[in-house]
């Protein structure tokens, strides 16, 4: 899926490298992050986001994994790591947002971690699976759709302009 995204065009980081090893791309979310225009995700009633990450460290504010969120209008969705290794999922339905965190399983530093976020529109829940364990489930009204903002979709960067650190958030 990363092949569908473009690397950030910031000329301040023209000398950056994107090393690859074992079919994985290594990037820091500061000089390298990815973006794309919205497309199929905005139309989907149900979808799964899947991430395979091996964080070497997490900032004290937490780090964005996936972001297409506007916190001012409570629109969109974001998946973030908190400073203590929990996975945070934010769903914005327009006018209100719901947040939930991994409970049963969290992310380990310097190890591969597999994260699934499964959004089920018809059933009215969102599952968070971390390393094969159903870590938490958020229930909301059945047939409730995420209201998507006009933001691009980002990997490794927070889309919300008012976040604490503009690179990763």
How would you name each of these model-derived features?
Residues 1-169:
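Extracellular glycan-associated modules
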């Amino acid at each position: 899926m990363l092949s569908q995204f473009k690397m950030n065009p910031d000329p301040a980081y023209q000398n950056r490298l994107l090393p690859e090893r074992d079919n994985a791309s290594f990037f820091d979310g500061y000089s390298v992050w990815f973006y794309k225009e919205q497309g199929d995700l905005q139309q989907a009633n149900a979808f799964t986001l899947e991430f395979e990450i091996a964080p070497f460290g997490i900032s004290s504010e937490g780090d964005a994994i996936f972001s297409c969120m506007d916190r001012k209008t409570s629109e969109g969705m974001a998946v973030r790591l908190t400073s203590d290794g929990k996975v945070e999922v934010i769903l914005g339905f327009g006018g209100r947002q719901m947040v939930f965190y991994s409970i049963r399983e969290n992310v380990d530093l310097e190890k591969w971690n597999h994260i699934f976020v499964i959004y089920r529109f018809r059933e009215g829940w969102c599952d968070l699976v971390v390393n094969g364990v159903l870590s938490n489930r958020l229930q909301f009204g059945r047939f409730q759709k995420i209201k998507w903002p006009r933001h691009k979709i980002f990997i490794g960067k927070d889309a919300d302009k008012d976040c604490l650190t503009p690179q990763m958030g």
